[in-house]
Every structure is written in structure tokens, then in C-alpha cells.
Amino acid sequence: MVELCGGEGEGQIMLATELAQLRAMARELEAKMDPDRVAARELCRALASSVDRSIRLAASCFPPPEHPPPAAGNAGRDAAFKKRKGMAKVRRQVRVTSVQDTASLDDGLSWRKYGQKDILGAKYPRAYFRCTHRHTQGCNATKQVQRADGDPLLFDVVYLGDHTCGQAAVAAAAQSAPPEHAGQEQQRQSSLLAAGTEGIHQQVVAEPMAAPFLFTSTAAGGVDDGYFSFISPANSDCQFSSDFSAGSVGVDMDHEARFEDLFSSTLEFFQSEIQNL
């Protein structure tokens, strides 16, 4: 058995001695190879033993490190993983109004998408975003967005790290906001608006037609031809009345807009009658 070296300098001397002896045995083996095979065989055994001692000396004096140094490519990856592991993580769920709706995912912050990949066992891919001020202001905030498997209108959003750029105040307000997103509020307001519009429409339809319009005119020569009324075939509820008298021509100004519609329908009726002649 070879004794372990006591110190680094002593171990180097013993190792150098063994290697020198090994070199001498190799030269002697080369000289005796052909004349005496028995002696050459014994010399080979001694050579193998010397090599074994040299290896043991080297192992005892220069032990390998407990953890081998990582490769250059893995070092940066491990450092980035440890850095992300120590970041603050905030999870939120955002509900959209439709499958094509992506505006509801806007949280008021400036992000840039840098990747997307399929997740094992997940139905939808996961998108990765980082702050747009990462290179200009050194902001390392990131977020991950993925559609929920059971509900295509629900998104899982994960924020990693805090914003250190100029939009830090906006980010704090967004992360402290309740889960209900602005898209839901917009949908609620749209429903209320639709209901209000429907009520207005019903009111307009149910409103009765005003009294018949009075159209006065003076006939040629000032002769009073009397009074006649006309029911429009386009709308039986609209009555057009005329009274030829000596008065001036006049139209009720409160119903001016409705009179224009009635006049248009009457004109269309007369045009169709003329074409049939």
C-alpha cells in the first residue's frame, strides 16, 4: 500500500520519483524484449505496479473537487434560474368577453412578447412577456399568460418580479386591483346600454301618431274648393288633410319632421299612379 502524502510539496516529489522509475523500467523493457522473454515478463509486472502506485499518489495528493465546475453555457442558465426563483410571484385570472378578445388582457403596462411554447399536459400554449424597458432601464419584470383548459374565456396570468422602471407605480396599482377586469365592467355597461336603448325603441313604437296635418292653400283665382282628406296607402295611420281657403299656406311646425315623411310617401303614391296610367 502506498502511504498518503502529508503535504502538497512532498506528494509532488513522491509522484515525480515514481514516474522517473516508470520511465526507466520502460526503457529496460525495450532493451530486453527479444533476448529474454521471462525477464521481460517480470519487468512488465513491475512496470504495471509502478504505474498503479503513481495513479494512487496522484489521487491522494490532488483530490478531485466535490462538485465539477459547470460548463460555460450552463453557468448562465443556472444563474438565471436562481434569479427567477427568488423573484416575487403574483397570480391573477382574467376573464375575456369572447375567444377572440385580447384587449381585456391589457393591464395598462408595456410588455414585449419574447416566446411561446406548448406545455406538457396543457391544452393551450403559454406566452412569455418581458418589460419593454428591460434593456433601457434594466427592468427584469416578466409575465406569463396561458388560457385555462376548462374555460377558454379565462386566462391565467403570472407576474414574476417587480417593475423597477418608470411604470412601477402603474404596475403596483394593477397587481393590487381586484380580480374583476375592466373588460367585465365594459360588458356590464354594454348590457345596460342595450337595455336602455330597447326601452327607448319601445317607447317610440308605442307613441301614438299626432293629429292629422292641416295644409291650407289658396286655389287659383281665389275659389274655395272645400276640404278633402287623404289616407296614405303606405301608412294608414298618417292622414293628410287639405283645406283650400283664402288663408295663407302654413304647416304645424311641431310636426314638421313627420310631415316630410308623409309628403315623401304621398309623392311615391302619385308617381306609381301616374306610371299605371
Swiss-Prot record:
Keywords: DNA-binding, Nucleus, Plant defense, Transcription, Transcription regulation. One of its GO terms (biological process) is defense response. GO terms for cellular component: nucleus. It is found in: Nucleus. The keyword Phosphoprotein does not apply. PROSITE patterns: WRKY. One of its GO terms (molecular function) is transcription cis-regulatory region binding. SMART domains: WRKY. Induction: Induced by benzothiadiazole (BTH). Induced by sphingolipid elicitor and chitin elicitor, and a compatible race of the rice blast fungus Magnaporthe oryzae. It holds the Pfam family WRKY. InterPro entries: WRKY_dom (IPR003657), WRKY_dom_sf (IPR036576), WRKY_plant (IPR044810). It comes from the Eukaryota. May play a role in defense responses. This is Transcription factor WRKY19. The gene is WRKY19.
